[in-house]
Amino acid sequence: MDIQLKETSSYAREADIDLSWEEIAADFEQAIKQFSKRVKLPGFRPGKVPRKVLMKQFQPAIEADFVEKSVNTYYLKALQEKEIIPINMGSVSDVHFHHGEHFKFKVAFEIEPDVTIPKMKRKSLKVEKTNYITDDEDVDMAIDEMRHGHAEVQTVEDGAQLDDYVICDLQEIDTSGVPIIGKKLETRYIKLGQIPFDGDNQKKLEGIKPGEKTQVSVPVDEKGSTSTFELSVQNVERQILPEVDEDFIKMADPEAENVADYRGRIKDRLGKAYDQRSEKAFDEQLTDAMINHVNPEFPPSMAESYLGHMVEDVMKNNPAATDKEKIKEIYQPVAERYLKWYLIRNTIIKNEEYEITKEDVQADIDQRKEANPKEAKELEKYFKKPSNRSRLEDDLMEKKVLAYLKNFTKIKEVKMNTKDLRKQSEGNVQS
């Protein structure tokens, strides 16, 4: 077999495959026998038609059948011989074959490209790292969240107040007050004072009681268009929050000694959570900086395949997401970023000869168990599953690659108060 490879881009290849008649004669004879079993000729039993008769009457059909069934076989042999792993289905063209002659054809396919990493200097990459500074309001909010989780719910008969929950039906009505058929929302929970039941809607709902009705204006699309709904109250509920006393602290955090200690422990946990948030954002910016530095080419088929899987997952997990083309448009940049990083990462792993051993994985699991002794058994059980160990192995490799990139990164540390984050969040909600 003669194989001529042509490189048409960093990821595209074209193979010209040429097999002599001597190499394929035996396979062609086998094709004749298989064809004979399927053909029906008067005076002959299936499989017993003489070769000469078959070739005289059906040679073009036999040749076409042979080509169709053999191209893939010889293509795979050529790939094995050249030690090539394609990432897509090859596109076959220029097929030439007749009995007694060479069998020639061409296949265009894509491979995972080799990525060239430019020479890295000490400050090749520039990345910001945000260090968050928490405050007492963060602690208060965390405690309030815990209190809401253990609140006692009471039915209210004397009228709704701010922060009460109104259980109601919402019937959309037209400008004349007539209900619109098919536009009724039943048994909805709304919180008084929470968007969109603030402002004018809040004033209408304050003091409302079970059995009463009012009209509210509610946004119905992303553009902010509103419709009028008749709101019928089924019930009003109020959350009675527990006091932050010794009993509450024992229930919320048995290891806390008193209120001050409880608040301190919450502040520590919040600090660790914000540190993790900071590290995650930094890692994403670091990979983005490296992607921009290298900007590798990627095979279109690879991107299309990965994007297809992403779209399937989105539609599977979100039944309301039905516009496939819109989802593809949204997630295409995400898929392309992932593939660029995947190619860069693999190149670094190969160049630096990185590996993650079983001992590395077990050491990380042991470290997790030591840090969380109460969850040691659960962790052991979780990481017995091969897919979870494989995911951990991949995470450890990611950390190793990112640690390598930090050697070539100028890091600008910036401080951000969490109160500024809260202001940003409030601004986003209002806009």
Set out the residue ranges of the language-model regions.
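Phosphate-interacting basic helix/loop segments used at nucleotide- and nucleic-acid interfaces
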Residues: 86-94, 142-163, 211, 269-272, ...
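Residue-level "contact hotspot" at macromolecular interaction interfaces
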Residues: 43, 96, 159, 204-207
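Extended, domain-scale alpha-helical bundle/helix-rich regions
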Residues: 63, 68-115
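Extended, charged alpha-helical "arm"/coiled-coil substrate-binding scaffolds
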Residues: 2-67, 151, 171-174, 197, ...
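Core FKBP-type peptidyl-prolyl cis-trans isomerase
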Residues: 27, 31, 124, 143, ...
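Internal alpha/beta scaffold segment
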Residues: 110-151
